[in-house]
């Protein structure tokens, strides 16, 4: 039993020792270097990369946005106007088709007896 208590006392002496060893000196130096790297170098590196990112990417992209935003807005308006024109053309085509169908059904119902000389309207509708 004395060897066990002797072993425990030696272990406590090593663990609670205030004497610096080569390993403890190296560990302290590593911890100090790590703290310096995290607090000083890493922050300055992040700041440098943030500035580089802003200068090379963000600012040019913002300049492009400012330069071409009005053009895109005009194109958007042009697309809306095109949609309106397309809709109007479809309405006119449908109306013309209904007129032609109505004319054909009217001529069929009356046997075509009321047909007069081809007027300009009839020529347009025949096309």
From Swiss-Prot:
Species assigned in the record: Vanderwaltozyma polyspora (strain ATCC 22028 / DSM 70294 / BCRC 21397 / CBS 2163 / NBRC 10782 / NRRL Y-8283 / UCD 57-17)
Protein localization: Endosome
Its job: Component of the biogenesis of lysosome-related organelles complex-1 (BLOC-1), a complex involved in endosomal cargo sorting.
One GO term describing the cellular component: BLOC-1 complex
Subcellular location, principal: other
GO biological process, one term: regulation of protein localization
Disulfide bonding pattern of the chain: none
Name recorded for this polypeptide: Biogenesis of lysosome-related organelles complex 1 subunit BLS1
Family of the protein in this entry: Belongs to the BLOC1S1 family.
Positions of region (Disordered): 103-127
